[in-house]
Amino acid sequence: MLTRFSQAQQRPHSVAILDAQGAHTYESLWNKSSQIAHQLLGGSSDLEQARIAFMVSPGLNYVATLWGIWKAGGIAVPLCLSYPLPSLAYVIEDTQAAALVIDPEYLVLLQGYAQDNRIPLHLVEDLQVG
């Protein structure tokens, strides 16, 4: 992973990810992941290995979320996009996730659960400034 972080800084204009929206550079990935990390930290200096569960579709936002959690000092817990709520709840509870980061399309599935269990829920797009 350190190699990828190093590439992001040494070759910012190289393509890091190709997805349905097109080509994304390491610079774009680095900036988005930094914004996500900053928002997740919420004024703290480190997440201190808090587990952050995330349900984000493959593409730039998935990798930016993963990197953002790592940059903030958290442990990323990817959630399977096809799991039903009871299976997701099991993973979230078993890992003791401190927060959830999701794509808007999963809001209906997880919003009530997050509220009932007092787990902070973040839309990935709200964690990014630009």
Predicted regions and their residues:
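ANL superfamily adenylate-forming
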Residues: 105-130
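Conserved ATP-dependent adenylate/AMP-binding module captured primarily in the ANL superfamily
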Residues: 83-113
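Active-site charged/polar residues at nucleotide-handling catalytic sites that mediate phosphoryl
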Residues: 47, 94-95, 117
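Residue-level detector of anion-binding/catalytic polar loops
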Residues: 75, 98, 120
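Conserved AMP-binding/adenylate-forming
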Residues: 22, 37-83
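AMP-dependent adenylate-forming
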Residues: 3-25
